[in-house]
Each structure stands twice: as structure tokens, then as C-alpha cells.
From Swiss-Prot:
Catalytic function, reaction form: di-trans,octa-cis-undecaprenyl diphospho-N-acetyl-alpha-D-muramoyl-L-alanyl-D-glutamyl-meso-2,6-diaminopimeloyl-D-alanyl-D-alanine + UDP-N-acetyl-alpha-D-glucosamine = di-trans,octa-cis-undecaprenyl diphospho-[N-acetyl-alpha-D-glucosaminyl-(1->4)]-N-acetyl-alpha-D-muramoyl-L-alanyl-D-glutamyl-meso-2,6-diaminopimeloyl-D-alanyl-D-alanine + UDP + H(+)
Sequence positions that bind UDP-N-acetyl-alpha-D-glucosamine: T13, G14, G15, N125, R167, S196, I251, A270, L271, T272, V273, T274, E275, Q296
Protein name, UniProt field: UDP-N-acetylglucosamine--N-acetylmuramyl-(pentapeptide) pyrophosphoryl-undecaprenol N-acetylglucosamine transferase
Predominant localisation class: membrane
PANTHER family: GLYCOSYLTRANSFERASE, UDP-N-ACETYLGLUCOSAMINE--N-ACETYLMURAMYL-(PENTAPEPTIDE) PYROPHOSPHORYL-UNDECAPRENOL N-ACETYLGLUCOSAMINE TRANSFERASE 1
CDD domains in alphabetical order: GT28_MurG
UniProt membrane topology term: Peripheral membrane protein
Superkingdom of origin: Bacteria
Family the UniProt entry places it in: Belongs to the glycosyltransferase 28 family. MurG subfamily.
Enzyme class: transferase
Amino acid sequence: MKTPHILMMAAGTGGHVFPALAVSEELSKRGAIIHWLGTPNGMENGLVAPTGYPFHAIEMQGLRGKGIGRLLKMPVTLLSATMAVIKIIRGNKIDMVVGFGGYVSAPGGIAARLTKTPLIIHEQNAIAGMSNRYLAKMATKVLQAFENTFGNDQLDAKLETVGNPVRNAISGVAEPTIRYDINDQSPLKLLVVGGSLGAQVLNDTVPKALALIERPFEVRHQCGRHNEVTTQSAYASEDLSAHEFTVQPFIDDMAAAYNWADIVVCRAGALTVTEIQNVGIAAIFVPLPSAVDDHQTANARTLTLHKAAILLPQNELTPKRLSDELALLDRAACLEMAKKGHALANRQACQHVADIIWQAL
């Protein structure tokens, strides 16, 4: 087989980009040449740059909930973006297009169809996004992380449940029984993660909740870029003398952060849920209420049903409620939650997805 050229489509958030990076690394090891389709100013630029993959940027924006103006411009924008991707596919002799989500997937998938290039899509969330629901009809293969994501019997012949790929560094974190020492009397280590962009409600609520807890915690809080000053101020305005805390805009090494933590308070994006499950760590999920089709609540459902995590809807999130949940936890309770989540994980997802892509070339 000649050296395959694969165009990966992933943009906008870490939930799309990191799984695509994990699979790209595996495909590169097998000899594939990876190209990346993204947007000019998306976070994928900085994440993909260190890999050295050729990066192709197109102008494309989201549609849902963005107003009538963008809706009216969308046909022209989509046509222009699709033509740009056709040029990329032909100019780089692309053998396969693989979509992991983000605004670029729609024009990329359409371009694959028009150039008769095989298309594989992967849906990370428990409820499929609008672009992937559309592209599923024309894709060669449709991959889903959760069962019944697409709910379409017509897709059965090409539909496969594979889990969510995670990076090798995450998979390499020691299992819960090694990390948790139930005899350790030091303060519980609390990791607060608002996703790659941060979560203002966590930035506001967590400091107030900690002020209500007498038992000390050691806190590491990822607040999102541009939120560091206001989050530092939120901590400074409370009496937190019992606690140690660090605030930072972004955590580059999530594997080290998970290895450090006893419990995570976080959103329920697909990547976050999958990483917590793979690592095996106690979690309190606060799903983003504005997420399309409430997919974050659906993402967290398996872990919460198995008592591997606590679900705390944002409309119920108050400093008192969060402090009550945290106050009930000790290392033994965290370990039990972590073991249950770890037992549910699919740690072969990355290799499985790469196998499917390789076999389809």
C-alpha cells in the first residue's frame, strides 16, 4: 500500500481536537501522512502546531443559535468553504477524510463526497451534533462513542460503537488503587476544570463553596483563558485560610493533573467524561445547560447511573449545595467512585478507531 494521506477535521474545542490528535498519532506510527483541517483562529492552531502536521485553515462558523444574519450568509460561506476543501483534497492527494467535529466538518464532509474521497466520522457526544447527523448519511463509516447516539436504523450497516480516543499520556496514569491511599490524612486534592475555555459559574461558585467548608482542601483551579484575574479575585474575596489554592488559565498537562487529584469538579464534555473514566477519578459533573440538545447531561449519565460520579445540574449549583457534596467525601469514598468509573472505561478506543480507518483505506 502506498503511503496514505489522511485529512483530519477537528476544530473549535479540545473535545474535538484532542481525540483527533490521539488517533493521528497512532496513524502516524503506522506510516500515514496526516493533514489537518481547521479554522484560522481556533484553538486547534496551537494544539496541532507542535505535531508538524500540515495545517489547512478555512473560514467557517457555527450556525445554531447565532441569529438570522449568519443564517442568511451560511449558503455562501458553506459553498466557499467546500470549494476550499475540494482544492485541499485534490492538491494534497488526500486518500481519506476523517471528521471529529467542529465547524469545519460540514464543508469537509461535503467536499469528500463531491471528490469521491472516503469519509469516516466520529461523534464524541452521547447525542450527535447537527453536522454529524447530516454527514452520517454520506459517510463510508460512522463511529460513535456511546450506544444509540444516532438512533437511526438506516445507519446500522456502517455504524460502530468505539468509545472516545484519549491521548497516551492520559491512558498512562496509574490506576485508582495505586493513586488513592485511604490512610492518607492530608487534605483532599480538588481539581476544578471548566473545559478548554473555562466555566464562569465554577469560577464564581467554587471559592464561595470552599469558604463554607472547615475541612481543608488543596485546590487547583483551571479557570479558562482571560478569566485568571477575576477568578483570583473571587478566591481573594473569601476567607479561605483553611485551604491552599492555585488558579491558572489552562492546564497543559492534564495527565499530571489527574494523577495529582482526588476529585474533579467539572463540566461534562465528552472528552472530560472519557478521560475521567479512563483514569478512574471521583467527579462532580456540572453539565453546561446551554449545550446543544443537553448532550453534556447525556454524556455523564453512564457514570452517574453507576455511582461513579455525582451529577449536579447548574440550576441546582449553589455554594451550599457544592460544599455539602464536597464535605461528604473522603479518600475512601473517592476511591470507590474512581474504581467504578475505571471499570467502565474503553481503553482501546484509539487503536480501534485507527484500525477502522486503516482498514478502510
